[in-house]
Amino acid sequence: MTAGLPAWRRFAWVLGLLVAAGCSRGSGAVTPKPIEERLLKIGNAYRNAVRRLGHAPKDFQELKPSLEGDATEDLLRSPNDGETLVVIWGVDYDRLPPRPDNPYVVAAYEKKGLGGKRYVLRFPLGVKAMTDEQWKKAVFPPGYTPPP
C-alpha cells in the first residue's frame, strides 16, 4: 500500500499510525484505586514532612502542612473498609538500615481491607495489596509489632 510513496510519506504514514495507536483508549494505562491514591498521598506528604521538619512526623497535625489540597483527617479513612488507616508515625524510613532480603518497610496500612487483601504503603515509596500470608511476612520498622 505504501510501496509507491516517497520515503518521507511512508515515514509520515507509519508515524501517524503509531501516534493513533498510542492515543487509543486501550493504551494499557492503569487507573489507580482510591485507596492507592490515598496511601501514596500520605507517603509523599510523610517524606516531605521529614524534610520540612528535620524529623519524622509524630502525628497527623505534623503531616498536615505537607499535604497538598484538602488536608482533613478523612484522608486517613480507608474507602475500602471504612476504618481509619494505621500510620506508623515517628519513623524516618530513609534512615532505616537496608535489608537485603526485603527492602520494603511498611509505613501505613488498612486495618481490615477488602476481599481478603489489605492495601499497604511501603518505603521505598509504593503501595501493595497484601494477602494475609504476605502480611505475616511483611517487614515493619524496628520496635513496631503489627496486630495479627
Language-model segments: which ranges?
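Sec-dependent bacterial lipoprotein signal peptides
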Residues: M1-A21
